[in-house]
Amino acid sequence: MQAIEKLFKLEEHGTTVRTELVAGLTTFLTMAYIVFVNPSILGDAGMPRDAVFVATCLIAALGTLIMGLYANYPIALAPGMGLNAYFAYVVVKGMGFTWQVALGAVFISGCLFLAVTLFRLRELIIRGIPHTLRSAITVGIGLFLAIISLKSAGIVAASPATYVTLGDLHSPPVVLATLGFLIIVTLDRLKVRGAILIGILVVTVLSFFFGGNKFHGVFDAPPSIAPTFMQLDILSALKGGVLNVVLVFFLVEMFDATGTLMGVAKRAGLLVPGKMERMNKALLADSGAIFAGSLLGTSSTTAYVESAAGVQAGGRTGLTAVVVAVLFLACLMISPLAGSVPAYATAPALLFVGCLMLRDLVELDWEDTTEVIPAAVTALAMPFTYSIANGLAFGFITYAVLKLFTGRAREVHAMVWVIAAIFLFKFAYIGGH
């Protein structure tokens, strides 16, 4: 006990071992759904689901463990929602790249991320991007997740006349997915920990009776990670056509992870002005996890906002994160259950997370059209072009041009001009996806 006290400085942070254990369990329950959702999404890109399941558990455990031991922060890491969907449905299925090349793009973005963190450039870049565009990126990814989830559940379907139309509302997947979404929202409103996880499991159990799904068991030895381990194609990812993908991964990773880390740390009272040493360690842990995740075989890893649930339960140190890491390692034994989860069981989770991401709309300045219009264009272009990259491109270009045309070019940070120019060059000479 004394060793734990000394390592995590529990007394200094006003917490106890018991409180940290409860906080760790709380955080885990709120984000454990990722071990089911991530293999489902990346599996649609042709990746071996069992191997992705192992990679997801391992990188969540490794990244969170480093966060706890190195930064002493009660923050958990795992493959991020949104970027996994972009990886699977846009980069691989839409743009035609292999998943190995997509992993290579994640690796390169992770290296860039690590470099800007080591050289303390991250804060400079973050400050250079307008707050409205940062908020719009979150909203756009939320809408992107929504359209993917509705399609996975069968609630919407393709239509040559109207582009999209209503699916078969009498089919078991649609009924079960709708029920799962209502369960998640209800449990969340009642402040039940693990609402998303419970919703996924309930729909999965019902699918055995009403959805024609087969039960493969619950516990077994972990499957092999060999099909995805070190399978990334870095050389192909360095080609010009993948620059667009790398830029998207890099920008979203940076905004999402930095915002989450600072938000949760602030809520825990760990963000002290002028003392950024621990935060910089947390940023390094986050950057390193992206790098390692691509080697194991999963999309970009990020800090989870669900960590706030553990902070709310009293978590204040890295011991909370260590507990989460141990629980993710334990998940390696439930691979048969993960393989039994159908796409329409994870669809409600995607839709719920997507809905929550729309809350950033309230942060937009609706009185200034040079701010809100680029934000709206960014958010709307993502689902309607089925591409996060296009949303970013249209948003940055629109922002720069509107400020220029209205005589407010001086308000535009140099970083915006650079990113807008890169996207313009890409559209003019490479084409768009």
Name these PLM-found stretches.
Residues 1-51, 164-166, 197-280, 424-425:
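Helix-loop-helix hairpins and the membrane-proximal interhelical loops
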Residues 2-38, 59, 80-138, 266-361:
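Helix-loop-helix junctions within the multi-pass membrane cores of secondary transporters/permeases
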Residues 25-32, 62-65, 69, 150, ...:
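Hydrophobic/aromatic residues within the transmembrane alpha-helices of Major Facilitator Superfamily
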Residues 40, 65, 69, 90, ...:
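Membrane-interface helix caps of multi-pass small-molecule transporters
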Residues 40-52, 90-101, 242-243, 342, ...:
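Helix-coil boundary and interhelical linker segments in multi-pass alpha-helical membrane proteins
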Residues 46-65:
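Loop-to-helix transition at the N-terminal end of transmembrane alpha-helices
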Residues 60-81, 112:
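Juxtamembrane transmembrane-helix boundary signature
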Residues 95-209, 322-433:
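Membrane-embedded alpha-helical modules
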